[in-house]
Amino acid sequence: MSSVIRYDWTAEELHALFDLSLPELLYRAASVHRQHFDPAEIQVSTLLSVKTGGCPEDCSYCPQAQRYDTGVTAQKLMDVDAVVAKARQAKLAGASRFCMGAAWRSPKDRDIPKIASMIREVKALGLETCATLGMLNTCQAQALKDAGLDYYNHNVDTSPDFYDSVIHTRQYQDRLDTLAHVRDVGLKTCCGGIVGMGETRQHRVGLLLTLATLPAHPDSVPVNLLVQVAGTPLHGTQTLDPFEFVRMIAVARITMPRSMVRLSAGRESMSDELQLLCFMAGANSIFYGEKLLTTANPETERDQALFQRLGLRPMHLMENVSNQDQHHGNVHADIACKHVV
């Protein structure tokens, strides 16, 4: 199957891919995948919550929203040294990228210098850096880039026409605007969504269509399977057919051939066999470590054993990322623009 990079996909084309027999869809996705990646290599990231809980948003899936009683206790922003210690552990375990997440609607300008210090120190360990901090304005995005940030994660979560069923405190366009700010300063984008929230296949098509028709495909596309947390509105939602999840991975791979397609939240509940199908469908990235922000993730030893059984190996740093212009000196700590989106 052709792996020409396209930005003009249609909903009809994506529906046609979803409607293929699963063996045929897997074959097409694997063919595209092999044109751009070594199928035996998996990029490994670790995600750390550097500021947990207390988020003012109402995302129906999120245990960190302060309005839901989920047992998550709000915490302050971690100290830089503690974050660096976690990053060292992640590197020793085989991670090549370290992502720092904060439960904010958007960061305050006063928080940016400390985040910038985290980025510089983690970068100095030889790791790629990623951050997910909520909505950014252009000035904040530039400050993070100047600190050496490689990737910024900001998911669109779902399709535009299902979005209002899940979130009311932030508009879909707000998410697209943040992605534009991130692209404008030259940061790489990490953007995906969540499935299993009660959406239909049409909504899953809409999510992938949004991603595949962005001005530039996300460099990383995290595909999350809903982790149902007691106390959140989506707790008790009917679970998604595992084969439908595999189809989601395969269509993401076909429509965004050069993107890293990441198995993200929900992997704890997946069998080894289901994960293998996802790798065959074009997934080539995972989150490593026992926790993803506040939810469980497979233990490192389990992932290492799975890699060994399947003959997979961790991917080394991507050259086009590690050779980016990096500034390890002074960061723009005193941000020129003072309004926060």
Swiss-Prot record:
Residues 40-267 form the Radical SAM core domain. [2Fe-2S] cluster binds at C99, C130, C190, R262. Keywords: 2Fe-2S, 4Fe-4S, Biotin biosynthesis, Iron, Iron-sulfur, Metal-binding, S-adenosyl-L-methionine, Transferase. It catalyses: (4R,5S)-dethiobiotin + (sulfur carrier)-SH + 2 reduced [2Fe-2S]-[ferredoxin] + 2 S-adenosyl-L-methionine = (sulfur carrier)-H + biotin + 2 5'-deoxyadenosine + 2 L-methionine + 2 oxidized [2Fe-2S]-[ferredoxin]. Pathway: Cofactor biosynthesis; biotin biosynthesis; biotin from 7,8-diaminononanoate: step 2/2. InterPro entries: Aldolase_TIM, BATS_dom, Biotin_synth/BioAB, Biotin_synthase, Elp3/MiaA/NifB-like_rSAM, rSAM. It comes from the Bacteria. [4Fe-4S] cluster binds at C55, C59, C62. Catalyzes the conversion of dethiobiotin (DTB) to biotin by the insertion of a sulfur atom into dethiobiotin via a radical-based mechanism. Homodimer. This is Biotin synthase. It comes from Xylella fastidiosa (strain M12).
